[in-house]
Structure formats: structure tokens, C-alpha cells
């Protein structure tokens, strides 16, 4: 009977449920020089998909912001919003971005990347990439 108490405590400690992790986004961007453009890519990893690409803007006064949504049937949408946030220099500018979506369960994902250009008006939405990516 003495062994039953510690055994029950051990089983209770080992069998406690944990909350599933929620997908996360790390978004980085910056201006690049010397390249006209780069293809948009979606590269899988262990629990991650890294999307990267370039958006050309009319000047250096634009800022990029990232967002994402995981929908039903593993549909992953990465949205890159582009806003005019300052005067910048008046020449075509290449804005590189990298969006790393993490904490994804393994499986095939239908990945869509959308660019939303807010300035100058009117707002324009472009589907920049679509493909299936397998996450380990």
C-alpha cells in the first residue's frame, strides 16, 4: 500500500495535458540594393515555413508589415501590407521581407502570399505566391 501513493503521484505528473502551441510569426524587412527582384519562396522546415520575397515601391518611404492566418485544411495565408510612412527618396526601392511562421504541426500546407499596397490609393491586392509546402 505504501508504494501506491508515490505511483499515483508519478502517473498524475506524467499524464497531465499540455496546451497545444499556437502558430507564431516573425516578420523582418529591409531595403536591398543591386538586385531587380527576387522570386517569392516558401521553404519548409521542422514546424516552420519561411516565406521571403521582394516588393518594389516608388520610393524609400514605404514600410512593410506582416500578418498570417492558418485556416481550415491547413490553408496558410501570409499577408504583407505596404504603407507610405515617410517621404523617402524618390527612386524605385526594393523592399526585402522574410516571414517565418513557426509552431506548425507536420503536414501539407496550401500557402498563399498576398501583397496589399495601400499607398498611393486605391488599395491594390496581389496574390504573389501559391503552392503546397510540406512541414516536417
Model segments located where?
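Primarily secretory-pathway and cell-envelope proteins
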Residues: 15-79, 120-136
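C-terminal motif of bacterial Sec signal peptides marking the signal peptidase cleavage site
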Residues: 11-13
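An anionic, turn-rich surface loop/hairpin at beta-sheet edges
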Residues: 79-105
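A short tyrosine-centered beta-strand micro-motif
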Residues: 107-113
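Hydrophobic residues positioned within well-ordered beta-strands of beta-sheet architectures
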Residues: 51, 95-99, 111, 131
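Positively charged n-region of N-terminal signal peptides that target proteins for export
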Residues: 1-4
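Beta-strand-rich extracellular modules
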Residues: 114-118
Amino acid at each position: 500500500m505504501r508504494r501506491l501513493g508515490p505511483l499515483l503521484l508519478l502517473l498524475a505528473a506524467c499524464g497531465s495535458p499540455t496546451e497545444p502551441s499556437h502558430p507564431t510569426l516573425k516578420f523582418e524587412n529591409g531595403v536591398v540594393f543591386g538586385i531587380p527582384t527576387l522570386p517569392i519562396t516558401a521553404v519548409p522546415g521542422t514546424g516552420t515555413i519561411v516565406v521571403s520575397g521582394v516588393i518594389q515601391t516608388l520610393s524609400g518611404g514605404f514600410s512593410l508589415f506582416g500578418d498570417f492566418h492558418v485556416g481550415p485544411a491547413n490553408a496558410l495565408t501570409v499577408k504583407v501590407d505596404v504603407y507610405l510612412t515617410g517621404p523617402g527618396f524618390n527612386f524605385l526601392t526594393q523592399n526585402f521581407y522574410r516571414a517565418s511562421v513557426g509552431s506548425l504541426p507536420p503536414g501539407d500546407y496550401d500557402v498563399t502570399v498576398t501583397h496589399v499596397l495601400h499607398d498611393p490609393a486605391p488599395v491594390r491586392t496581389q496574390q504573389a505566391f501559391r503552392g503546397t509546402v510540406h512541414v516536417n
